[in-house]
């Protein structure tokens, strides 16, 4: 994953918007700002039906863009980050709607950001993703990435999920309850937090196992290091990646999860303060 951006030679910036929402006004404002720096704004083909701007499929958009803007909420950014890993491209999150943990500023603040950006005043953070290996009953392995989390939960018919977790074929825990969250540090402030999991610093090389509504009083979240791969077995459960992709666990012979070697470059304002964000979002202190 790229460690720096050649901000002096940016030619094209891609843009992907929150789905099913018209953001034409915001797109035109970004185009106007970028034109000052002689940068072309190109769109994902589903981002606008009206605007007369170059439009591309997602793969082509990543290929031709120096980096890509996510205009929406955290969900838009999360799905884009998984794609960005395939093309070694950075992502900038601008929020449109509810404020999240991952997007940094609104379109109204974009002029100030890009003025600083094109002077080299920005920072890049590279959080790690989870690798998920799904092996079907014919032995074919499908690898997926998760930016926030992988959630194993009971289906509608099951009264309780029974989830077994192994490392190197040795069982080290089993969970009875509503489910299990496997979260990245970046995802530790999402579903993991609402299930009383710990907040882990975004750039830590670790991941978290957090039980959901455990039927045991002694089950607690655990933080595991990079290089610690787990195998998860559960019948009649659903595996969900980032709240966006669902798989029936009965369809697979083996499911393994661990912190990936892949990370994604996120562009932030230079003055971004992770702990100040936590303080504001979680109402810490005064």
Curated annotation (Swiss-Prot):
Gene3D superfamilies to which the protein is assigned, alphabetical: Probable inorganic polyphosphate/atp-NAD kinase, domain 1, Probable inorganic polyphosphate/atp-NAD kinase, domain 2
Compartment(s): Cytoplasm
Instruction: Kindly state one GO CC term assigned in the UniProt record.
Output: cytoplasm
Listed HAMAP family:
NAD_kinase
Q: So where does NAD(+) get bound? A: 74-75, 148-149, 178, 186, 189-194, 244
Q: What does the similarity note say? A: Belongs to the NAD kinase family.
What is the primary gene name for this protein?
A: nadK
**Enzyme class, broadest EC rank:** transferase
- GO MF, any single term: ATP binding
Full protein name: NAD kinase
Entries under PANTHER family matching the protein:
NAD KINASE
GO:BP terms for this protein? Answer: NAD metabolic process; NADP biosynthetic process
Keyword Transmembrane present in the record's keywords: the answer is no
**What are the positions of the active site?**
74
Which SUPFAM superfamilies is this protein grouped with?
NAD kinase/diacylglycerol kinase-like (SSF111331)
Task: Provide the reaction this enzyme catalyses.
Answer: NAD(+) + ATP = ADP + NADP(+) + H(+)
- What are the alphabetically sorted keywords of the record? ATP-binding, Cytoplasm, Kinase, NAD, NADP, Nucleotide-binding, Transferase
- Asked if the record carries the keyword Nucleotide-binding, the reply is yes
Cofactors needed by this protein, per the record, are:
a divalent metal cation
Report the main location listed first in the record: cytoplasm
- The catalytic activity of this protein is classed by the Enzyme Commission as 2.7.1.23
Q: Which species is listed as the source?
A: Campylobacter jejuni subsp. jejuni serotype O:6 (strain 81116 / NCTC 11828)
Give a short account of what the protein does: Involved in the regulation of the intracellular balance of NAD and NADP, and is a key enzyme in the biosynthesis of NADP. Catalyzes specifically the phosphorylation on 2'-hydroxyl of the adenosine moiety of NAD to yield NADP.
